[in-house]
């Protein structure tokens, strides 16, 4: 709705196809959650999803012209209803009072486009509710376990699991394995000998944020606000100032700031990166390093950016920000996937979420980061189609029960889009006037 990376400008025209594709996939997530709410699996939707307006922010004439063209394109599309646009300082100050404080509107013009259809999602709470439901249905959940190896053994996969507390190991055999191990997914797929990931590499990037719980500030910023990347800057460099709701408590987060650690998981090993380097993926690493100097420069700058430097970045959004109100928090660890490419590039950065499976459909995994969790149900539908295609006809009724628009194009079917939107808004408790700009 507001991320400008998904609506690039090409030869003076705004391409909204990626934004439409991601929006369509996110609607499947909303349908899946709504189905689970109606069936008692998710018992408290407002614990994980809350209405929060989404805003796109432009600074300077070039960005304003881009944002105006983007707004015109999205406002005419049924998948982005009730989009609004303003470039006067009075509306800006009314909608974003915190960001207007200390701002010299005469020195640099600004503009915003916004929609009240946005949400804030706490995926930790969502995951917790799914696990609670699994336990209620008799599922035993074992924590402190790490999959250390996956090997083919006849018609089965032999999965080695280690108890991280005792060191004891257990072997589980399965006909199908799904690898949803975050930053460790690529390593496990490589250990399994999946040829589809030959030459793949991963580069870890940590995320840091400035956070404030000062309610005097929080109450003046009831939105997620995304800006535009500087010319030549990588997509992950785009900062945003967000209202977040966690366990019912509102906070503001600004970032992300890129950090660097060789770990592939937040609690991983400092040897993760070095152990992942193999003969087949060295060209991928070298190719990306040589052809993505902007990314290398960005990471170096971010690693050496101190607290005052982080606050200086915040000043672009909130000019009157005082560092005393903010603290640095370390978020998760993401592994940027590097895909092998032909000469002369050798390696390319993959910025989306990729589903990888072997040709027999017996093992699959998810690689990549953004948009990540928000489109997981759509990724799992794709997995079913790839790996269990012979069962899809038998499973059709159940899939349509869980995803009423499964098989339909929400990009083309406005009536279907509107119907599912009304249903999910009501079921998820989002049909409210609270938190609107």
Residue ranges and their predicted role:
Residues 110-176, 374-387:
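Helical element adjacent to the flavin cofactor pocket in flavoenzyme catalytic cores
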Residues 179-195:
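Flavin (primarily FAD) binding-site architecture
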Residues 18-30, 57-66, 113-135, 142-144, ...:
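Short beta-strand to alpha-helix junction loop
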Residues 1-94, 251, 263, 271-272:
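Dinucleotide-binding Rossmann-like beta1-alpha1 core, especially the glycine-rich loop
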Residues 1-5, 196-223:
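Central beta-strand plus flanking loop segment that forms part of the substrate or channel wall
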Residues 104-117, 125, 260, 264-394:
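C-terminal catalytic lobe of FAD-dependent flavoproteins
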Residues 44-56, 94-137, 158, 294-298, ...:
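Helix-loop-beta segment of a Rossmann-like dinucleotide-binding subdomain
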Residues 217-291:
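An anion/pyrophosphate-binding glycine-rich loop and adjacent beta-alpha core
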């Amino acid at each position: 709705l507001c991320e400008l990376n998904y609506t690039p400008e090409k030869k003076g025209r705004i391409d909204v196809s990626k934004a439409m594709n991601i929006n369509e996939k996110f609607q499947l997530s909303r349908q899946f959650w709504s189905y689970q709410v109606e069936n008692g699996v998710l018992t408290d939707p407002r614990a994980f999803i809350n209405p929060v307006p989404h805003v796109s922010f432009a600074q300077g004439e070039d960005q304003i012209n881009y944002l105006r063209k983007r707004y015109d394109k999205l406002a005419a599309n049924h998948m982005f209803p009730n989009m609004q646009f303003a470039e006067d300082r009075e509306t800006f100050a009314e909608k974003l009072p915190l960001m207007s404080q200390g701002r010299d509107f005469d020195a640099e013009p600004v503009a915003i486009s916004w929609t009240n259809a946005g949400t804030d999602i706490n995926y930790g709470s969502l995951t917790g509710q799914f696990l609670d439901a699994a336990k209620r249905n008799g599922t035993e959940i074992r924590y402190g376990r790490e999959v250390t190896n996956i090997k083919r053994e006849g018609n089965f996969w032999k999965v080695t699991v280690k108890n991280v507390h005792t060191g004891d190991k257990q072997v589980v055999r399965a006909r199908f394995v799904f690898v949803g191990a975050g930053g460790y997914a690529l390593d496990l797929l490589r250990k399994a000998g999946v040829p589809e990931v030959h030459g793949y590499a991963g580069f870890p990037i940590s995320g840091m944020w400035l956070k404030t719980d000062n309610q005097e500030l929080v109450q003046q910023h009831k939105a997620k606000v995304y800006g535009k990347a500087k010319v030549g800057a990588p997509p992950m460099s785009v900062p945003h100032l967000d209202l977040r709701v966690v366990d019912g408590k509102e906070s503001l987060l600004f970032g992300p700031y890129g950090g660097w650690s060789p770990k592939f998981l937040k609690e991983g090993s400092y040897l993760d990166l070095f152990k992942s380097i193999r003969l087949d993926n060295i060209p991928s690493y070298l190719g990306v390093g040589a052809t993505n100097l902007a990314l290398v420069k960005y990471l170096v700058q971010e690693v050496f950016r101190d607290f005052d430097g982080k606050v200086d970045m915040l000043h672009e959004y909130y000019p009157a920000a005082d560092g005393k109100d903010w603290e640095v928090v370390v978020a998760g660890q993401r592994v940027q996937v590097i895909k092998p490419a032909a000469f002369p590039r050798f390696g390319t950065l993959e910025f989306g979420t990729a589903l990888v499976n072997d040709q027999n459909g017996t093992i699959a995994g998810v690689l990549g980061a953004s948009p990540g969790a928000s489109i997981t149900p759509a990724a799992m539908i794709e997995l079913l189609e790839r790996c269990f295609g012979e069962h899809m006809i038998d499973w059709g009724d159940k899939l349509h029960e869980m995803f009423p628009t499964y098989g339909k194009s929400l990009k083309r079917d406005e009536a279907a889009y509107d119907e599912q939107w009304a249903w999910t808004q009501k079921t998820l408790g989002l049909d409210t006037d609270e938190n609107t700009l």
